[in-house]
Amino acid sequence: MMDQARSAISNLFGGEPLSYTRFSLARQVDGDNSHVEMKLAVDEEENTDNNMKASVRKHRRLNGRLCFGTIAVVIFFLIGFMIGYLGYCKRTEQKDCVRLAETETGNSEIIQEENIPQSSRLYWADLKKLLSEKLDAIEFTDTIKQLSQTSREAGSQKDENLAYYIENQFRDFKLSKVWRDEHYVKIQVKGSAAQNAVTIINVNGDSDLVENPGGYVAYSKATTVSGKLIHANFGTKKDFEDLKYPVNGSLVIVRAGKITFAEKVANAQSFNAIGVLIYMDQTKFPVVEAELSLFGHAHLGTGDPYTPGFPSFNHTQFPPSQSSGLPSIPVQTISRKAAEKLFQNMETNCPPSWNTDSLCKLESSQGINVNLSVNNVLKETRILNIFGVIKGFEEPDRYIVVGAQRDAWGPGAAKSSVGTGLLLKLAQAFSDMVSRGGFKPSRSIIFASWSAGDFGAVGATEWLEGYLSSLHLKAFTYINLDKVVLGTRNFKVSASPLLYTLIEKTMQDVRHPIDGKPLYRDSNWISKVEDLSLDNAAFPFLAYSGIPAVSFWFCENEDYPYLDTNLDTYEKLIQKVPQLNKMVRAAAEVAGQFIIKLTHDIELNLDYDMYNNKILSFVKELNQFRADIKAMGLSLQWLYSARGDFFRATSRLTTDFHNAEKTNRFVVREINNRIMKVEYHFLSPYVSPRESPFRHIFWGSGSHTLTALVENLKLRQKNSSAFNETLFRNQLALATWTIQGVANALSGDIWDIDNEF
């Protein structure tokens, strides 16, 4: 074929043969790959001895041949291309005809596949009904009874066995992934060599043993002290301030309740008491058994107090350290019977305003001292946290965490069995809703079983400390299931303001299982929301990690009397709450609706506008001290500006969401990311997480909080010598900048920030 082409070209140009025509399509050095290079090699036998005139004629003839040769080659190339293209089209047309014929003859499989109806997206009404149906089919009390059979102190073999049981249950539920997380922590237990003891020393120096208590207070200082005994009511700061007797160098006895053991001990220590005894009075805790033992812990914080601010993983090389929240004085729980024996050696009746037992006395009789000996020992133990996840269908890297404490000192029916049983049943129900009910959560749901909750949310806090960077802008809500049923009369809640709107909608949807009325009964319910306490596992999520958290429970007007005792049994719980199954089901419906709304809706159900009210309340409180602030040469103008910028940022975010194209996942995700930043950026960036782990300026603890700022300012009027002006100046400046930082984060990108600061 090449010979024929060469012959044709030769004839075209007057029969003069050319050796070859070569095209080079290689990429040139300058990057132009569209250049076509054509080279003509002439016969080497040409006579090179021609004169100048013949040479000129030959070059002209060669240029003409080059031009005509180029045209000929292009024509041949186009003819070949057209022939090939027409042949390809013919084959394609034949194949299309075959396909058309197959379709016309009725290819039933293809038609059937095209006509499969697509499953429609489930909406809120559908999901609410689906959840209710799943919960109706569950018997909760059998699981609670099973879990309450034995004591399961953190790190014990029984605690570990229960962890493996929960892990296997998660696997049986076919969750997307199940895993465990282990930590090596230090907890305090009663010493085996010597018992803890409370003794009365009379005027003659003789001792009379009051009790070797069955319970104890973890993280108490192990020592022996002796001194006068003074009653300090509940041991609140105000109770100590109202005492007519100085507690300096004395032991104090306080009633259980109202605040945590750790706060009672910290207050006593701040007033220079040398030791603390804690008991349950019959007025507040109407327990028949006067010798009932009580358990608690005295760490003013959460997590392992010997690895503050960092996780307790095995073989970590952190230097020895301990939390500043550990007490430097001994503390011990005693029975009501022991307290009454101590009162027999005391004088002066307790004030009627205390509303306590008639036997209550205020101070030791003349010459009578009390000796307290605590011999607790530290024990390093392995604890297991168990996790299971249902992965989201659109944003699996965004998730909520639903958790419950697993361990308990004693049977722990109300303390941890109800929560653990509820955790298991919710995991089962939601797994079934996804696999069979058509529920497709956009975001993931993590179910977590914590250990060492009795020692200050140790398991939960260590997990947060270990994975804080991984959880940032991924975990956006924590739902706590601990102690959700302690009665039937009231429904109470503690939560981040970001969740208030979600809680209100849920209370309007869920009905009380006894009277059938909605849980929402008071339009002013937000003012009655209780702050998360140190002994609540939701607290470190909010105050340490900046993750919005919620804890809720059904209860009576009085405290449940058996928590943290050996009488926290299934039988006692059923006796107090006869319709336990219905109450747990109602709690499951509350938690279930939280889960659905947080994982299903396009926009995160976090109402950032609620913090406008919190900031405004803080500004109003400071305004009461304008004269004092002005006297120091300071102004609140910058705080007003920061508050205004936050308000404008929230308004702009709301507008951005309303104007956003809801089908554009990238845009919606960007808006949700801005919402997720709100809680986190209320963590003060100006304090060390190790020195002040609870950095949240609203809900944390330390001098960086807004509460501490106001308390310091109040001292200027009450006790000017105790007021620290330098500290106040720093507090005001850093609080202002923290609020401004939240406003900036909420605004979005740096070029979107337009503030007046």
UniProtKB/Swiss-Prot annotation:
PA domain: residues covered: 220-310
Annotated GO biological process: intracellular iron ion homeostasis; positive regulation of B cell proliferation; positive regulation of isotype switching; positive regulation of T cell proliferation; receptor internalization; transferrin transport
Subcellular location: Cell membrane; Melanosome
Cytoplasmic side: 1-67
Gene3D superfamilies associated with the record: 3.50.30.30, Transferrin receptor-like, dimerisation domain, Zn peptidases
Changes after translation: Stearoylated by ZDHHC6 which inhibits TFRC-mediated activation of the JNK pathway and promotes mitochondrial fragmentation. Stearoylation does not affect iron uptake. N- and O-glycosylated, phosphorylated and palmitoylated.
Record-linked CDD domains: M28_TfR (cd09848), PA_TfR (cd02128)
Region (Ligand-binding): 566-757
Claim: Disulfide bond is one of the keywords in the record: yes
Glycan-linked positions: 103, 248, 314, 719, 724
Domain of life: Eukaryota
PANTHER family per UniProt: N-ACETYLATED-ALPHA-LINKED ACIDIC DIPEPTIDASE, TRANSFERRIN RECEPTOR PROTEIN 1
Role summary: Cellular uptake of iron occurs via receptor-mediated endocytosis of ligand-occupied transferrin receptor into specialized endosomes. Endosomal acidification leads to iron release. The apotransferrin-receptor complex is then recycled to the cell surface with a return to neutral pH and the concomitant loss of affinity of apotransferrin for its receptor. Transferrin receptor is necessary for development of erythrocytes and the nervous system. Positively regulates T and B cell proliferation through iron uptake.
Protein name as annotated: Transferrin receptor protein 1
Native source organism of the sequence: Cricetulus griseus
